[in-house]
């Protein structure tokens, strides 16, 4: 009886601490803006593999390397907390992240995950792909997936922003993953917006990364239950 009471009280205390920590969590929201002349849309040339062309029924596929949205913001920018979490430990997320080779392109083009979080790699195409990850801080991997529906699971052992993933069979295929030791990151959507939730109160340096335009950093102080706005602006080349 005493043991059951002790277990109940321990569970109750942990629940209260968990609820309090999350109820006091802060949020960073914002946009990644684009300034300058909007670059022309670049189409991918898939002539090296007739199966890829057939998948798209002859239609051209736009590159996701630089996507300027209708409101002059950038899609596919990786935004994350770069500094301010030193000394804090966060449990590794157990849910799988996924990257799919579909239509001879990677889905998603940019994403984030935690170090040692499982990454499921899927080939949804009826053609040969190989996925070649090129981290500098973790062990690279390069494996073939010759059959439709094949799945493999890999991890990155160490944080790194960004890790390039490519296909040696199809030169136009590329994706980028931000690997972190914490879960505080986001990727801009088709409105250029991002949201980073669940932050402890503190002073942070937030970085926005873009495949073409590089990086920018901003400093922000987030209070308990606070929501702060941080906007970035990249200028076209």
Where are these regions (language model features)?
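Intrinsically disordered, low-complexity peptide-like regions
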Residues: 2, 20-22
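Bacterial N-terminal signal peptides that target proteins for export
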Residues: 1-10
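Bacterial N-terminal signal peptides
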Residues: 9-19
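Extracytoplasmic copper-binding redox domains, predominantly the cupredoxin/blue-copper superfamily
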Residues: 22-237
């Amino acid at each position: 009886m005493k043991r059951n009471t002790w277990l109940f009280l321990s569970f109750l205390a942990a629940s209260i601490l968990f609820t309090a920590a999350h109820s006091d969590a802060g949020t960073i929201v914002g946009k990644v803006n684009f300034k300058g002349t909007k670059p022309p849309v670049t189409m991918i040339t898939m002539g090296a593999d007739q199966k890829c062309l057939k998948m798209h029924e002859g239609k051209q596929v736009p590159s996701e390397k630089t996507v300027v949205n209708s409101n002059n913001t950038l899609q596919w920018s990786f935004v994350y907390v770069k500094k301010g979490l030193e000394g804090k430990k966060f449990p590794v997320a157990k849910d799988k992240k996924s990257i799919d080779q579909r239509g001879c392109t990677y889905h998603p083009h940019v994403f984030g995950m935690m170090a040692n979080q499982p990454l499921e790699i899927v080939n949804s195409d009826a053609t040969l792909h190989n996925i070649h990850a090129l981290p500098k801080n973790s062990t690279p991997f390069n494996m073939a997936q010759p059959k439709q529906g094949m799945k493999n699971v890999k991890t990155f052992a160490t944080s790194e922003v960004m890790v390039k993933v490519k296909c040696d069979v199809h030169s136009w295929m590329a994706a980028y993953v931000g690997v972190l030791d914490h879960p505080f990151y986001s990727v801009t959507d088709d409105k250029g917006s991002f949201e980073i939730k669940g932050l402890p109160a503190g002073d942070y340096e937030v970085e926005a990364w873009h495949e073409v335009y590089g990086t920018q950093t901003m400093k922000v102080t987030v209070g308990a239950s606070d929501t702060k706005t941080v906007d970035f602006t990249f200028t076209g080349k």
